[in-house]
Amino acid sequence: MVPKLFTSQICLLLLLGLMGVEGSLHAKPGQFTWAQWFEIQHINMTSGQCTNAMQVINNYQRRCKNQNTFLLTTFADVVHVCGNPSMPCPSNTSLNNCHHSGVQVPLIHCNLTTPSRRISNCRYTQTTANKYYIVACNNSDPVRDPPQYPVVPVHLDRII
C-alpha cells in the first residue's frame, strides 16, 4: 500500500508540475493587463524582422516563444472587431467571447527555427500573408486600460 500511494503522489506531483509549466508558457507578465499584453504580442511589431521583434516578447517571458503572429493593423481596429457578433472560440468552444475579423489583414507569422537558452540567440523565419483572424475579447481593466475601450482584445484565437 505504501509504495502504491507514494507512486501515486509522485505521479500527481509530476502532473501538476507539468500543468504549471504549460500554464506559465501562456501567462502574461504581471505588469500588463491582458489587453496590453495582446498589443505587445500581436500588434506592436517593433521591427520588420521576426528575430528582432520576438526579442521584446521573449525578454518579458524569459524564454523563446515557438511562434507568434503579428497583425499589421492598429489596436483600435482590433477593438472594433470586438463589436462583431460573438461566436464560440475555436480553441475552446466552451468560451463564447470570440469575434471574427470579417476582413483580411496583412500579418507576419514568426516561427522559431533556432532555439536557444539565451534569448538573444533565438532565430525566427517569417511568413507574410493576408488572412482573417478570430480574437477573444473581454471587458477592459477600468484602471489600466484605455478608457475609450470598454471591451478589448485579450487573445488571438485563430488565423484563417
Swiss-Prot record:
<protein>
    <recommendedName>
        <fullName>Non-secretory ribonuclease</fullName>
        <ecNumber>4.6.1.18</ecNumber>
    </recommendedName>
</protein>
<keyword id="KW-0255">Endonuclease</keyword>
<keyword id="KW-0540">Nuclease</keyword>
<dbReference type="GO" id="GO:0004540">
    <property type="term" value="F:RNA nuclease activity"/>
</dbReference>
<keyword id="KW-1015">Disulfide bond</keyword>
<keyword id="KW-0325">Glycoprotein</keyword>
<dbReference type="InterPro" id="IPR036816">
    <property type="entry name" value="RNaseA-like_dom_sf"/>
</dbReference>
<dbReference type="GO" id="GO:0004522">
    <property type="term" value="F:ribonuclease A activity"/>
</dbReference>
<feature type="signal peptide">
    <location>
        <begin position="1"/>
        <end position="27"/>
    </location>
</feature>
<feature type="active site" description="Proton donor">
    <location>
        <position position="155"/>
    </location>
</feature>
<feature type="glycosylation site" description="N-linked (GlcNAc...) asparagine">
    <location>
        <position position="138"/>
    </location>
</feature>
<dbReference type="GO" id="GO:0051607">
    <property type="term" value="P:defense response to virus"/>
</dbReference>
<keyword id="KW-0458">Lysosome</keyword>
<keyword id="KW-0456">Lyase</keyword>
<dbReference type="GO" id="GO:0002227">
    <property type="term" value="P:innate immune response in mucosa"/>
</dbReference>
<feature type="disulfide bond">
    <location>
        <begin position="82"/>
        <end position="137"/>
    </location>
</feature>
<dbReference type="GO" id="GO:0005615">
    <property type="term" value="C:extracellular space"/>
</dbReference>
<keyword id="KW-0378">Hydrolase</keyword>
<comment type="function">
    <text>This is a non-secretory ribonuclease. It is a pyrimidine specific nuclease with a slight preference for U. Cytotoxin and helminthotoxin. Possesses a wide variety of biological activities.</text>
</comment>
<feature type="glycosylation site" description="N-linked (GlcNAc...) asparagine">
    <location>
        <position position="44"/>
    </location>
</feature>
<dbReference type="GO" id="GO:0003676">
    <property type="term" value="F:nucleic acid binding"/>
</dbReference>
<feature type="glycosylation site" description="N-linked (GlcNAc...) asparagine">
    <location>
        <position position="111"/>
    </location>
</feature>
<feature type="modified residue" description="3'-nitrotyrosine">
    <location>
        <position position="60"/>
    </location>
</feature>
<dbReference type="Pfam" id="PF00074">
    <property type="entry name" value="RnaseA"/>
</dbReference>
<dbReference type="InterPro" id="IPR001427">
    <property type="entry name" value="RNaseA"/>
</dbReference>
<comment type="subunit">
    <text>Interacts with and forms a tight 1:1 complex with RNH1. Dimerization of two such complexes may occur.</text>
</comment>
<feature type="active site" description="Proton acceptor">
    <location>
        <position position="42"/>
    </location>
</feature>
<dbReference type="GO" id="GO:0005764">
    <property type="term" value="C:lysosome"/>
</dbReference>
<comment type="similarity">
    <text>Belongs to the pancreatic ribonuclease family.</text>
</comment>
<feature type="disulfide bond">
    <location>
        <begin position="64"/>
        <end position="122"/>
    </location>
</feature>
<feature type="glycosylation site" description="C-linked (Man) tryptophan">
    <location>
        <position position="34"/>
    </location>
</feature>
<keyword id="KW-0944">Nitration</keyword>
<feature type="disulfide bond">
    <location>
        <begin position="89"/>
        <end position="98"/>
    </location>
</feature>
<dbReference type="InterPro" id="IPR023412">
    <property type="entry name" value="RNaseA_domain"/>
</dbReference>
<feature type="binding site">
    <location>
        <begin position="65"/>
        <end position="69"/>
    </location>
    <ligand>
        <name>substrate</name>
    </ligand>
</feature>
<dbReference type="GO" id="GO:0016829">
    <property type="term" value="F:lyase activity"/>
</dbReference>
<dbReference type="InterPro" id="IPR023411">
    <property type="entry name" value="RNaseA_AS"/>
</dbReference>
<feature type="disulfide bond">
    <location>
        <begin position="50"/>
        <end position="110"/>
    </location>
</feature>
<feature type="glycosylation site" description="N-linked (GlcNAc...) asparagine">
    <location>
        <position position="92"/>
    </location>
</feature>
<keyword id="KW-0732">Signal</keyword>
<dbReference type="GO" id="GO:0006935">
    <property type="term" value="P:chemotaxis"/>
</dbReference>
